[in-house]
Each structure stands twice: as C-alpha cells, then as structure tokens.
C-alpha cells in the first residue's frame, strides 16, 4: 500500500540513491561513540541489540557496562544463575528479554561452541532473537547483507516512501520488509544499518521530526505532502485493560519480607511484594513467624506496562518477626537500608522507599 500513486517510483532520487545518501549522512552526522560501536564481537553486539529493544540508548548504556563488567564473556553469562541475570537487569523492564538472554547464552555455549552463527537466518533461530535483531547482529558482527526493520526504521521508510497503513498490520509489515530488502546497498552494510537506526532515533522522530537536516528531505513523500504527523499510521485504538493487585508490605522495623516471583509473568524471577488481600494479613504474618502489631494502607500506586495499567494497593504491616531467615527459598528478608540500590521492580522499590526509616 505504497501511497501517492506509487511513491517508490515518485521518490525516484530517494529510491535510487537512498542507501548512498544514508551512508554519506551517517559517516558525517551519525552516532559513532556508542560503547557497542567499538567492537565487532558478536557477544557484545548481541547484548546491546537485546537491551536496545523498546529501550532508549541513554537507559541502556549503564546497564550494558554493568553487564560486561559482571559477564565479560558469553561463557560466564551462560554459567551464571538466572537470578543473578535478572537482578542485574532489574529496572530495564521487559524481563522476558533477560530470561531469553540467559537461555540464548546457554544455547550458544552448549550447542555452538560459544560462537554465534554468521547468517541472520541462523541467528534468528536462537532464543529471544527476531528477524530484525538477527539482521543487525549479522550486519554489525559479520558484515552480512541483511535488512533490519525495527520501529524507528518502519517510521523512516513509511514517511520517505509514503507507505500507508499501520506498520504493525501483517500486510503493511510485509510491504515494509520487501521495501527494506530492496534498498540494501551492495557494500558498507554496517554504515547503512547504523544510519537507518540513527536517522530514526535523531531526525525522523515520532513527533517534530527535523526534516530540514534529513538527507532525504527533498525526496521524502511525507515531507513533500506535509504528512509527517500522519505517517506512519497510528495503531488502531483500543482500551488498555486496568488491573489491580493487593500486596502486603511486611516490615519488622529494619527488614521487609519479599517473595521471589515465578519465572513467567510480570517481574518474572525478581523479588517483589507478596500478593495477599488485606483480610489475610494476620494469617500471612503468623505463617511466617511474625506477630502483627499494626497495619496501615498506603496510597495506591499506578504503573503502566505495554499491555495494561496496574494499580498496586499495598497494606503496610508492622510486625514483630522471628530474626531467623525465611524458611522457604522463595521468601527473603531484605534490609530496608539497602532498598535504594537493590535490584527490584521500579514500582516495588517506590513503595519500599516510602516506608523506609529515615
């Protein structure tokens, strides 16, 4: 559904010389100092690409550095307990990425001798790696000629070539993939791939794009027709579900009792507050060797995920606790003084900081 009467042909200069313009622009104006750009090591490239999924560069940089400090090789990552990986990931969100990261490392080490395959089709067979991510890893690590199509690239192509429709729709996505494949240059694939990422992240932004500085400014369909705000088409709106969860915040003055979440679901594998209704607080405290002294409801805390909004309703329970550790592996008493630096889900940390002794 290429609009404007066949915009790929209309934007002749852009269609014929898209890659050349983009590469020249990237060489002069693109990003060159990101930490993962200084290597072709597939482990480091893969780590950066997984972290960058749905996450801004500025957020990824410190996590990337900490991960490499803790796990400088894929062998060390594969051998680490999953809890260590999840704790290091805490705060970056989308925790399935961390679980797939760990599983992928184990597959590469255990089945592939610690070496990533070179071809994008082979890389895409590994856990947690889709077609676009596989192409980026293959291009940056091995110079393979493969097309990427993440959210930023979809926006660039939809605007430049006038592709109509929501990019997440199967028919539109297929069209964008075909377009992305057709534009691949014969050489300099690394600069071209990085240029696409840079253009979408720095100039062809979702709102208020910097069209005058864009290397495609004179051939972009969206700019020529003043449709930057319309392309790409927005996702059809539907109501985002609202969920509520009752949690207990059990403290003995210095510590808080936390539960290790199941591997799947939100905050999978991380420590969080137990989901218990207020009416069950006393029985819950007794079951964990505590005597309930006082209860106080906290203000509801709202947190948004990709597919739903969550309201946490926490009951702060002050208890006299058995000073021994938790009796079951899934339960841990954590010192409240360490909460600020602890690897916890963001909303859980906010609740705990609100009750931490000053």
Language model regions located:
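Intrinsically disordered, low-complexity, charged terminal extensions of DNA damage-control enzymes
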Residues: 1-32, 37-38, 201-358
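Catalytic cores of DNA base-excision repair glycosylases
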Residues: 2, 18-212, 216-229, 240, ...
């Amino acid at each position: 559904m290429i609009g404007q009467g066949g915009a790929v042909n209309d934007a002749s200069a852009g269609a014929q010389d898209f890659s050349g313009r983009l590469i020249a622009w990237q060489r002069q104006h693109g990003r060159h100092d990101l930490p993962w750009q200084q290597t072709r090591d597939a482990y480091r490239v893969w780590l950066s690409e997984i972290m960058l999924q749905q996450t801004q560069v500025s957020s990824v940089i410190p996590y990337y550095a900490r991960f490499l400090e803790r796990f400088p090789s894929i062998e060390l990552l594969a051998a680490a307990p999953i809890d260590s990986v999840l704790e290091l990931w805490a705060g970056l969100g989308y925790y399935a990425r961390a679980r797939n990261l760990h599983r992928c490392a184990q597959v590469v080490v255990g089945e592939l001798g610690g070496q990533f395959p070179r071809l994008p089709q082979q890389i895409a067979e590994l856990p947690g790696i889709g077609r676009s991510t596989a192409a980026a890893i293959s291009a940056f690590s091995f110079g393979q000629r493969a097309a990427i199509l993440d959210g930023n690239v979809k926006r660039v192509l939809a605007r430049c070539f006038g592709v109509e429709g929501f990019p997440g729709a199967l028919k539109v996505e297929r069209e964008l993939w075909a377009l992305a494949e057709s534009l691949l240059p014969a050489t300099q694939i690394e600069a071209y791939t990085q240029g696409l990422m840079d253009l979408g992240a720095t100039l062809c932004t979702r709102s208020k794009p910097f069209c005058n500085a864009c290397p495609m400014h004179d051939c972009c369909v969206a700019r020529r027709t003043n449709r930057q705000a319309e392309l790409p088409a927005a996702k059809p709106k539907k109501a985002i579900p609202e969920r509520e969860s009752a949690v207990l915040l059990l403290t003995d003055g210095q510590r808080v009792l936390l539960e290790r979440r199941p591997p799947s679901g939100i905050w999978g594998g991380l420590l969080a507050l137990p989901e218990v209704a207020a009416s069950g607080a006393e029985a819950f405290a007794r079951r964990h060797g505590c005597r309930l002294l006082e209860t106080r409801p906290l203000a509801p805390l709202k947190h948004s995920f990709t597919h739903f909004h969550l309201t946490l309703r926490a009951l702060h329970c002050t208890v006299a606790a058995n000073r021994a550790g938790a009796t079951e592996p899934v339960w841990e008493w954590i010192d409240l003084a360490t909460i600020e630096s602890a690897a916890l889900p963001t909303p859980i940390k906010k609740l705990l900081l609100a009750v931490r002794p000053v």
